[in-house]
Regions:
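Conserved donor-binding loop and adjoining core beta-sheet/short helix segment
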Residues: 29-87, 189-209
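Conserved beta-strand-loop-alpha-helix junction that forms the acyl-donor binding cleft
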Residues: 101-112, 234-246, 263-267
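Active-site rim helix/loop that mediates acceptor-substrate recognition in acyltransferases
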Residues: 24-47, 158-187
Length: 268
C-alpha cells in the first residue's frame, strides 16, 4: 500500500540498502542526497512509502504540479516490481492525463520494464559530468549576462519544445542565470543555467550553426562555472556524443564514472 509520509526517520536501513546497490540507486540521489532528505521542505514535492506485508519495499519523491498536469519522479528507491506497480496504480487513479517524467538508473531493470509496458518514450543513456572549477583556458569572446535589450532575440532563438521555455526561465531569474554570446551586436548563442543551489546545472545551451566549433559553447559554460563560485555544476550528456563531451571537458567538466542515467516520459 502506497501512503504519503512526513519523515524518513524509520526508513534509514531501507534507504541504505537500496542506495548501496549500484543496480538500483537513484541517479538524483547520487547527484545530491538532499533530493530525498530535503523533499519535505520543497514546495509541491511529496514523499511516499510503499508497504507490502509489513515491510517497506519502496520510497518515492514526486514533484506534482496540478495546474500544469505535470509530475516528475525526483527520487525512486525500490528493487520491487510490486512497489513500482503500486506507484503507477496510484498515479493512474489520481492523475490521469498528466505527463510524468523519470530519470532512472540504466541498470534498474524492474523500473525500466514497467516503463516499457506503459509505452514510455526513452532518451539515450546520459553520462554524468561535474565541474568544480572553470577551465584555465581563456576565450576572447563576448559573453554577457542577459539584459532586457536582448529579450526578443533570446526568445526567438530559444528551444521551444521543452518545459523551461525562454518565458519560464525569464520568470524565474531568482534561480536561473542566462548567458548570451554576442558577435558584432548580434546574438549567436545562449546558456540557461541555475545558480541558486549547491549543485547547479545547465538547462539549455544553443549556439547558431555557423558559430559552432569556434569556442562559444566552451566560453558560455566556462563563464557560468566561474560565476558559480564554490558551488559545483553538473550536466548530463549523451554517452555517444563524443564531441559534446569534449566541449564540456574543455570548459572544466569531468566525466563521473558509474552514475549514468536515462530520461523517460509517459502520459498517465
Amino acid at each position: 500500500m502506497l501512503e504519503e509520509i512526513t519523515s524518513l526517520d524509520s526508513y534509514e536501513a531501507f534507504i541504505n540498502e537500496i542506495c548501496s546497490d549500484e543496480n538500483y540507486v537513484d541517479p538524483h540521489y547520487l547527484y545530491e542526497n538532499n533530493n530525498l532528505y530535503c523533499a519535505f521542505e520543497r514546495r509541491d514535492q511529496h514523499v511516499y512509502v510503499n508497504i507490502d506485508g509489513g515491510n517497506t519495499d519502496g520510497i518515492f519523491v514526486l514533484l506534482i504540479l496540478p495546474t500544469e498536469k505535470y509530475i516528475e519522479m525526483i527520487v525512486g528507491l525500490s528493487k520491487s516490481k510490486h512497489a513500482y506497480n503500486e506507484l503507477f496504480q496510484y498515479l493512474e487513479n489520481n492523475y490521469k492525463g498528466y505527463r510524468c517524467d523519470f530519470v532512472i538508473n540504466p541498470k534498474n531493470v524492474s523500473l525500466k520494464n514497467i516503463l516499457i509496458s506503459k509505452d514510455a518514450k526513452f532518451e539515450s543513456e546520459q553520462q554524468l559530468m561535474i565541474a568544480r572549477f572553470p577551465s584555465h583556458k581563456q576565450y576572447p569572446l563576448d559573453i554577457q549576462l542577459y539584459t532586457e535589450q536582448w529579450k526578443q532575440a533570446y526568445i526567438d532563438m530559444h528551444v521551444k519544445e521543452i518545459y523551461w521555455t525562454a518565458e519560464k526561465v525569464l520568470s524565474a531569474l531568482d534561480r536561473f542565470r542566462v548567458f548570451l554570446a554576442i558577435h558584432q551586436e548580434q546574438l549567436v548563442g545562449y546558456l540557461d543555467v541555475t545558480y541558486a543551489y549547491k549543485q547547479n546545472e545547465p538547462y539549455s545551451l544553443i549556439v547558431l550553426p555557423e558559430y559552432q566549433n569556434l569556442g562559444y559553447e566552451q566560453a558560455l559554460l566556462s563563464k557560468a562555472i566561474q560565476m558559480n563560485g564554490t558551488n559545483t555544476m553538473m550536466t548530463l550528456v549523451d554517452v555517444n556524443a563524443k564531441e559534446e563531451i569534449k566541449i564540456y571537458e574543455e570548459a572544466g567538466f569531468d566525466v563521473i564514472k558509474g552514475q549514468n542515467s536515462i530520461f523517460a516520459t509517459i502520459t498517465i
